[in-house]
Each structure stands twice: as structure tokens, then as C-alpha cells.
Amino acid sequence: MSQSSAEAPVTTATGPLVIKLGGEVVGGPALAILSSDLAALTRAGARAIVVHGGGAQATRLQERLGIPVRQVAGQRVTDADTLDVMKMVVAGKLNVDLCAALVAAGARPVGLHGASGPALSAVKRPPQVYAGAGPEPVDLGLVGDITGVDRGLLELLGSGGYLPVLACLGAGADGQAYNINADTVANRVAIELGAAGLFLVSDVPGVLRDVADPASRIPSLTVAEGRALIASGAVTRGMIPKLEESFAALAEGVRRIHILGRLKPGDLAREASEPGSIGTVLVP
């Protein structure tokens, strides 16, 4: 009997797969599909690490609690109350919900956050100038820049057949926790572990020539082609920082990066074995 695409062998001899799940995915109806696909990948022999965010859910809880939501250039300004919300939502509810869904699908997840190990060492980001936010440096508060990834911890879990599930919070040497963008975490983990592929899964089906037309998905992009799209204005808004961070990760050795979303069963494994078949694959 031939194997289904979800169970087809996926080779990661050159490095693990890093899969970043946006909060809209972790908290949405596609979670069961993704959990099943991730479990199938690990059963097929793939080494994988999951990174997740939770910005949309954190925003909703802040609004319910009456905590102001401020963003600068897509970055969440994080005071002490906002950081507590991120801990509750991202390292708490969403990490547990994702791990529970993976257990139900047959995987062996281990939920982690930056202070676990610490898996993600960080320092406070100094004030800096952000595009569109005026000429003066802006202090984002308790937002961190990654200074280290505990590669040994993540590889130890993977070698034991476990699936690390990492929430996007970092920890400083002084015990201070920091909010970190999930795309940034995923890119850095992929770089540090020499990932065979990085998958950025959200509700966007890939890089589109026309944001209003899902059929305009671009299967494959080089860095030069991606920069030309940005310069032409075809790529806008949140896709620009996603592409810019991806370009930097490719320059530092990540072999390929996949941008995809709205997945059906088996799509994740298919994209891993047939790059560009489901989303957009970025290559150097």
C-alpha cells in the first residue's frame, strides 16, 4: 500500500524543520489539521521544532482587562501588565492548547518558553528609530532581543523523540522575561540549529502578487525577486517585515523558508517534500 502524503518520508538529515504557527492558527479551527500533520511528520522520521505566537489573543485579553494596546511598526509596546498578558496567553493557554492537540494527534510535545532552560536568552531592546514612527528613538518596554538559543536542550528533546513547542518569550540573566516577536524567534532558532527548512504558517496562503486574489500565489522566490516585489509595491504591510527577516535567515544559512496557510490535511508534509506546491518557498 502506498503512503499518504501526510505519512510520506521526509528527510531532515541536514537539519530539523522549524515550524512557526501564528496565534490565529493555534487558536483557530485549523489546529487539529496542523497537529495531525505535525504528528505525521515526526512519525515519518522528521525532526521538528514548533514555535508559536499569540498576538491576536493577547490583544483581545488586553482589551477585556482594560489594558491599552500600543504598537509601533507592528511591534507590541510591552509594559509590565502587557507582559503578564503575554505570559498568560502565549506561554499559558495557547502553549497548553497546542500541546494538548498534538498529544491527541499522537505526537510527544514538550511545552517550553524562554525561561525553560533557558531556551531563549534575551536582553532588553534599546530604544531605536522605527520606520513610520517618527525621527525619535522609541522604547518598546519589555521587548527583548535574542542573545542565545539553547541548542543542546532542543536537540536533546528531538533526539528522544519529543517535539519541542516553544512560546515566544525570552529570559534575561537577571530573571526578567521579555516579549519577542514569534517570527524573530523562529528565524533565530532555524539559524542556530541549521534548519533544513523553516515554515511560517498563518492565515495567508503565501506571497501574493495581488493580496485580494489567493490564486496569485507565487510558488517560489529568490531573495532578489522578493526585494524587487517589495520595491514595486506589490508586497505591502505585514508581509514586508516577514520577508525581510526571512532574507536575513537565508543569508545566515537557513536553506529554504516556506510561507503558507489555509492548510488541508497532508499539506504540510507535501510542502516539505515538494517546496512551493502549497505556499511560497523562499530560497537564496
From Swiss-Prot:
Is the keyword Amino-acid biosynthesis assigned to this protein? yes
Its pathway? Amino-acid biosynthesis; L-arginine biosynthesis; N(2)-acetyl-L-ornithine from L-glutamate: step 2/4
Enzyme class name? transferase
Q: Which GO terms describe its molecular function?
A: acetylglutamate kinase activity; ATP binding
Any one cellular-component term (Gene Ontology):
cytoplasm
Q: Name one GO biological process term.
A: arginine biosynthetic process via ornithine
- Establish whether keyword Nucleotide-binding is in the entry: yes
The chemistry this enzyme catalyses reads: N-acetyl-L-glutamate + ATP = N-acetyl-L-glutamyl 5-phosphate + ADP
Keyword annotations from UniProtKB, A to Z: Amino-acid biosynthesis, Arginine biosynthesis, ATP-binding, Cytoplasm, Kinase, Nucleotide-binding, Transferase
Q: Main subcellular localization, coarse class?
A: cytoplasm
Task: Tell me the domain of life.
Answer: Bacteria
Do you know which Pfam families this protein is assigned to?
AA_kinase
Which InterPro entries does the record cross-reference, listed alphabetically? AceGlu_kinase-like_sf (IPR036393), AcgluKinase_fam (IPR004662), ArgB (IPR037528), Asp/Glu/Uridylate_kinase (IPR001048), Glu/AcGlu_kinase (IPR001057)
HAMAP family reported in the protein's UniProt record = ArgB (MF_00082)
Q: Per its database record, what is this protein's job?
A: Catalyzes the ATP-dependent phosphorylation of N-acetyl-L-glutamate.
Family per record: Belongs to the acetylglutamate kinase family. ArgB subfamily.
For this entry, the protein name equals Acetylglutamate kinase
UniProt organism field:
Sorangium cellulosum (strain So ce56) (Polyangium cellulosum (strain So ce56))
